[in-house]
Amino acid sequence: MAVNPLDFLKNMSSVKNNIDNIKKEISKITVCGKAGSNIVTIEMDGEFNVKKVSINKEFFDDLDNDAFEQMIKSALNDAVSKVKEEIKLKTMGVLPFGM
């Protein structure tokens, strides 16, 4: 069966529109990664930019440096995982060929 080049171009235009829509949806994603019973909270957008870091000062003085660093790392990893999951949900079934 021969492929019509015009149909192919129409499909590519549709794919481009889908990708543009997905990019818009991803840019709207905002998640919060949390660690240590919410001692550290990190807000991240869909492009993996950290928008806000919150530290519950009530617990801050009681933490040693290693524990605090571990909580920051855990909160960042939690936020990254949540962004990836949101992207996966928003792109599922939209892109062709398993893109």
From Swiss-Prot:
Consequence of changing K23A = Forms homodimers, but does not bind DNA
What keywords were assigned to this record?
Cytoplasm, DNA-binding
- Conditions for induction: Transcribed at high levels in rapidly growing cells, but is undetectable in stationary-phase cells.
* Protein's cellular compartments: Cytoplasm, Nucleoid
Recorded hits in InterPro entries, A to Z, give: YbaB-like_sf, YbaB/EbfC
Known function: Binds to DNA and alters its conformation. May be involved in global regulation of gene expression. Binds specifically and non-specifically to DNA, preferentially to the 4 bp broken palindrome 5'-GTnAC-3'. Affects expression of a wide variety of genes, encoding both structural and metabolic proteins.
Question: Can you tell me which family this protein belongs to?
Answer: Belongs to the YbaB/EbfC family.
Instruction: Indicate what this protein is called per its UniProt record.
Output: Nucleoid-associated protein EbfC
Which species is the source of this protein?
A: Borreliella burgdorferi (strain ATCC 35210 / DSM 4680 / CIP 102532 / B31) (Borrelia burgdorferi)
Q: What is the lineage of its organism?
A: Bacteria, Pseudomonadati, Spirochaetota, Spirochaetia, Spirochaetales
